[in-house]
Amino acid sequence: MEKKRFFEPWIPEKYNEGINGKKILVFGASYYCKEVNCPYYKDCTSVEKKDSSLYDKRCPSYIASNRCLHDEPSYTTDGARANSNFARLFSPYVKDGEDIWDYLAFTNYVQFFLPCSKDDSGKVSSAPTLPEHLSPRDFDAFIEVIQEQKPDVVVIWGTVIAEPIRDRQNNPFIYDLDECFDNTEGYICHMNIPNVDHDIVLFNCYHPSSRSWNESFEDAARYLDVLLKR
């Protein structure tokens, strides 16, 4: 059967051990390509085609490192500001000196590389993921990865990817949206997915690179504590 996902999720050594016995899978929003001078850049990052797979083994930058595009995020779990901000949320649940990313599985929701922007000075930077960057394939890949990894908790970064995931018409597996907003301010709800023999907890927080992340950090920490100590 053809895979819906393009990106191979990062599954660390201690994923099955989990945090407080819970396996946790994190979904960020998207990956970006900053190689704006690459001959394949325009096609590989096309927001119309939404498909980088043609260049999986042809990307010059990755070939030079003996890598494939689909290997992300194996090479992106170190150092990024969003990752370090997010790690702070989970740091109370691991021992001093331990890396939280030794326990948390990670991938991104959007299944192709988004383009970056280049300003007049030549500086290349990423921009926020937008609703038009998403496609039905991304949701199918989301479900596929959950079925493969069977986490107890799925963490969703940001409001853009949360929209299709928490849309009853798009996601028939979610069953307690009303209670989610009434009881947990939108942070916690649940899914029942075929081929997974337990309910999945969805934990929706703001994106760790956003201003709202810092503004709502205490709320997120409070609901995460409730979730992990159940």
Locations of regions flagged by a protein language model:
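A polyanion-binding, active-site-adjacent surface
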Residues: 2-149, 153, 159-163
